[in-house]
Structure formats: C-alpha cells, structure tokens
Amino acid sequence: MSTSDQKRETIMKRSLLVLAMGVALSCTACAGGSDTDKVNGSISVSAGQPATDVSTVNGGVRIADNAQVKSANTVNGGITLGDGAQAAELDTVNGSITLGAKAAVSGTVETVNGGIRLANGADIKGKLSNVNGDINLDSAHIGGGIETTAADITINGSSKVEGGIHVQKPSGMNFGGSNKVPKIVIGPGATVTGALDFEREVELHVSDRATIGSVRGATVQKFSGDTP
C-alpha cells in the first residue's frame, strides 16, 4: 500500500472514530461526564491536577503551564500545551497544535488540517505529522521525524529533527492547499538527521550553517544569513 493510500485509510478511520466518539461521549455527557471528557466545549487543565486523558469533539484543549495529561484529543479545535507542560500524545483533526517553551510530549503529535508550532526547548519524542498547515520549530527537538503533504516547514535556531523529513505526494482526496508547492527552510544552526525524502515538488532552502542528512526528490538551495 502506498503512503498516500495509507493516509487516505487513516483519515477514513479517523472519520469513523469521530462518529464513535460522538456517540460514546454523548452517553458520558448524559451520565454526568467529567470536565475532561466532552462533546461540545473547550477543556482546560490546570497544573496540579492528576494526569488523565482529555478529549472533546467540538472545542479546543488548553493544558496550562507545568500541567500534565496523558493524551489530549479533539476533532474540531486546537490544542495548546503550555510552557513546561507534559503529555503522552496530542491529536486533532481540524485545528492547530502549539507547544510552549520546554513543553514535552513522550509520543506523537498529529493534526490533519492545522499548523504546528514548537517554542524554544519544546520536545517531541515521537513523530510530528500533518497534512495542511505550517510547521514551525524554534530551537525545539523532534525524535521521530516530520511527515506532511502540503505544509511549509521552518526549522530555526538550534532545532534538531531526528528521523528526517518526509513530504508525501497528495492523494486523490482534495485537501486544501495540496496543489501549493511546499517551502522547506532549514535555518542556521538547525540539524536534521536521517533522510529528507520528497515525493512531490518542494522548495528546499538550507542554510550554509545547517546540518542535514541525505536528500531525495529535491534540489538543495543554499543560503547565507538568517533567512533565504
């Protein structure tokens, strides 16, 4: 099965999961569900609360500075992990994901339609992935690589991405922005280990002070200074 087919299958499964979550969470709500398990409405987690799974269907998730959760999931809404906060995984369908300074995720970070931003010192042990939406790293770390279809990617400061970068070709499904040529910028001082693998046309700009692995499917455009 091709990577594009796998992505289609993943999103089909995700759509079914949305329906299942709606039914299950509706039943929970009828029974007086907790503030960390909703159908409609945003969720906020304060520091000092016991770490638990948090999920909603229609609403954002805000995890305060230095707070802890297990997984944080929503369907229609963004997720914010505050400065120094910790989570096992972050997952949304339609919404952005933001990690504050020194925030840490021990697993994966994934959105379908939404940007992802990592502040100084943020750390993701697993993979970071999306389909659409800009990906921005500012002196952050990713242990499991970056995967996208149509995102512009900017890797700045002392950021280190282990596991490479994989840009998939668009599938037959029409995701907004999939016809736009993604722009990949690896700035001065940044490091990407592993392969940079591009299945579609991209603009690949790499600082003469950056370190990268092997490149397949794109031509490196070197630049000096802070930006291309």
Q: Language-model segments: which ranges?
A:
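Intrinsically disordered, low-complexity terminal regions
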Residues: 1-228
